[in-house]
Amino acid sequence: MPDYRSKTSTHGRNMAGARALWRATGMKDEDFKKPIIAIANSFTQFVPGHVHLKDMGQLVAREIEKHGGVAKEFNTIAVDDGIAMGHDGMLYSLPSREIIADSVEYMVNAHCADAIVCISNCDKITPGMLMAALRLNIPVVFVSGGPMEAGKTKLANHGLDLVDAMVVAADDSCSDEKVAEYERSACPTCGSCSGMFTANSMNCLTEALGLSLPGNGTTLATHADREQLFLRAGRIAVELCKRYYQDGDESVLPRNVASRKAFENAMTLDIAMGGSTNTILHLLAAAQEAEVDFDLRDIDALSRKVPQLCKVAPNIQKYHMEDVHRAGGIFSILGELARGGLLHTDASTVHSPSMADAIAEWDITQTQDEAVHTFFKAGPAGIPTQVAFSQATRWPSLDLDRAEGCIRSVEHAYSQEGGLAVLYGNIALDGCVVKTAGVDESIHVFEGTAKIFESQDSAVKGILNDEVKAGDIVIIRYEGPKGGPGMQEMLYPTSYLKSKGLGKECALLTDGRFSGGTSGLSIGHASPEAAAGGAIGLVQDGDKVLIDIPNRSIQLQVSDEELAHRRIEQDKKGWKPAQPRARKVSTALKAYALLATSADKGAVRDKAMLDG
């Protein structure tokens, strides 16, 4: 049987000094025989998705101790992408994922912890912790802070979110009073933003990977039911420790749970629910940490056969995460996929022997368990608050309509091809990504004229100054992992195109990425990026570009000979923006850029450079 890792610092005469320090943290003689379970919390007062997590670590800790473990909590950083959006703060968002992954590794390995409970929530925190968990490969359970309630206002007949506030603010026809009303109403409670944005997408995907509990991605942050997820996570962490260290059961290790089958399940779910394109970036990065052979070609293959079963804001205004929960949450989507023969039901989870067992227990259309039905009736209270577990409102009924409800069956899918697609062509030889769930069908094939911007800042200025016209394809380049550096999100350009009435009249292509709040014909992750010699750096103003989503292609309408000539000229100039940018790049960001790969590799560090 494997020894507890913690014995390295808790056993033997030569560890007297280490034990003295452990005792100073509160440990007693009997504790040195127990597993030490790290709690990686991400509480911060900067981020609404994390502002309520201050006491969650100790809630989990008490449960761990009650069931025979020793709990030790530490914190990671957490960047709010919405607050960092639209200025140089966004340069730090994606790099923070690597910092979070490294910090979890540092803390867990430095102190020889035996297992981890990861308390995450927002955009880069869940991916960073996921990368660390798969890198460390010791027992782990994920539990997130949960989504916020959708906003409400008398000025709109649908739920509101952050993107609504941004769009009205950029719309010159909207009064200051309307903008203020949306601003005050869009984000009413603690929790991750209420739509199927990156944070909620990733928290849902941890359910499909088998590393978190049913309801993790959809139970509201404010609802009393969420407390049970934290408590159960603590109990399961102790159980997993016992199964691995006492029974030698390696099946509980994260690399065995998050197998290739699990990654295919997660991506299948992502496509079916129209998740954020950022999830592709993060799943590719996580797969590399798990040493799973899973790449953009695999995602492309899945995108061609998986239907879209769920549409949530920003892809449709009618539904938010609270509505997904009412319809049965993630295990109801997984159940529909399983019945369509699109899921590996033999994949394991940290809470059930197999995905099939979990679906049988948690899919509301399959189980008659009243407790499960009651759980998924948890709904919003409509009371602004930053307090977790502060309300216990329940819907009077579940959404069981699989023909026209929030979650559809395969037979009644929103579309027979899913909500994400990978495009290839001479402008993106290694691929680029589009969230088709947010693209109007009328522009699935679009030919337009390139309008070049060498930064997000110049693109925003150009859009607001009416330099972009109907029929243009906005090209924003040198915003990739190396070129930015940091691969900024382009939520402001896409939101401003919508506010200018160009949401269905223009496209946008970038080697940067998009917020989960983005909709429209917005194509990101162009690989290789411009700074790495990608063809997006060769496009000129006035070039024609043909986008063909059904055929998964994106083509610059320029001859191979002309592209070769342009490449020779660009090599002479160097792969950098044509116009200087007023952008200060810190030493920390330069260090990130030095090792960063393009988006098709997950924007992870280039290990070949480290190994070489």
From Swiss-Prot:
Modification N6-carboxylysine, positions: 124
Cofactor binding description: Binds 1 [2Fe-2S] cluster per subunit. This cluster acts as a Lewis acid cofactor.
Ligand binding ([2Fe-2S] cluster): 122, 193
Keyword Chaperone tagged: no
Catalytic activity: (2R)-2,3-dihydroxy-3-methylbutanoate = 3-methyl-2-oxobutanoate + H2O; (2R,3R)-2,3-dihydroxy-3-methylpentanoate = (S)-3-methyl-2-oxopentanoate + H2O
Pathway given in the UniProt record: Amino-acid biosynthesis; L-isoleucine biosynthesis; L-isoleucine from 2-oxobutanoate: step 3/4; Amino-acid biosynthesis; L-valine biosynthesis; L-valine from pyruvate: step 3/4
GO molecular function, one term: 2 iron, 2 sulfur cluster binding
Alphabetized UniProt keyword annotations: 2Fe-2S, Amino-acid biosynthesis, Branched-chain amino acid biosynthesis, Iron, Iron-sulfur, Lyase, Magnesium, Metal-binding
Binding positions (Mg(2+)): 81, 123-124, 489
A GO BP annotation: isoleucine biosynthetic process
Record's signal peptide: none
Cofactor(s) this protein cannot do without: [2Fe-2S] cluster; Mg(2+)
Domain of life of the native organism: Bacteria
Keyword Iron-sulfur attributed: yes
Enzyme active site: 515 (proton acceptor)
Gene Ontology, cellular component aspect: cytosol
Function: Functions in the biosynthesis of branched-chain amino acids. Catalyzes the dehydration of (2R,3R)-2,3-dihydroxy-3-methylpentanoate (2,3-dihydroxy-3-methylvalerate) into 2-oxo-3-methylpentanoate (2-oxo-3-methylvalerate) and of (2R)-2,3-dihydroxy-3-methylbutanoate (2,3-dihydroxyisovalerate) into 2-oxo-3-methylbutanoate (2-oxoisovalerate), the penultimate precursor to L-isoleucine and L-valine, respectively.
Family as reported in the entry's similarity comment: Belongs to the IlvD/Edd family.
Subunit structure: Homodimer.
Name under which the protein is recorded: Dihydroxy-acid dehydratase
Organism, as annotated: Stutzerimonas stutzeri (strain A1501)
Gene behind the chain: ilvD
